[in-house]
């Protein structure tokens, strides 16, 4: 099982006034690394257009540092801040 946590920066001035580094966090679990990588490398809107999106656990605004504790790898891709944790069980 692969768990992916992906954060997209929020440019909305309303959220920027509330928190310094707001992001939309999307968390999802996958059965294979190939499926996980497809999600990691996709734009959220494009991904949801191709899939029904019902299996996404949560989309919420939160502070960047709140997800930082479990980050294994942090990379920039296509304008997104992507945080993902690969974990097998």
For each of these PLM feature ranges, what is it?
Residues 1-6, 27-29, 57-62:
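Ser/Thr- (and often Asn-) enriched beta-sheet segments in non-cytosolic proteins
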Residues 1-25, 82-85:
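Short aromatic-glycine-(Arg/Gly/Cys) micro-motifs in beta-strand/loop hairpins
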Residues 12, 32, 54-55:
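Intrinsically disordered, low-complexity coil/linker segments enriched for acidic/polar
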Residues 37, 41-89:
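Short, mixed-charge low-complexity intrinsically disordered segments
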Residues 7-10, 31, 75-76, 89:
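Secondary-structure transition/turn motif
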């Amino acid at each position: 099982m692969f768990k992916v946590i992906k954060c997209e920066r929020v440019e909305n001035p309303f959220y920027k006034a509330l928190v310094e580094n707001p992001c939309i966090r999307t968390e999802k679990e996958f059965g294979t690394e190939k499926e996980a990588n497809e999600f990691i490398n996709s734009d959220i809107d494009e991904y949801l257009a191709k899939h029904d999106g019902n299996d996404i656990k949560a989309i919420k605004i939160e502070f960047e540092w709140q997800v930082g504790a479990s980050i294994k790898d942090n990379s920039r891709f296509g304008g997104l801040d992507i945080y993902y944790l690969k974990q097998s069980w």
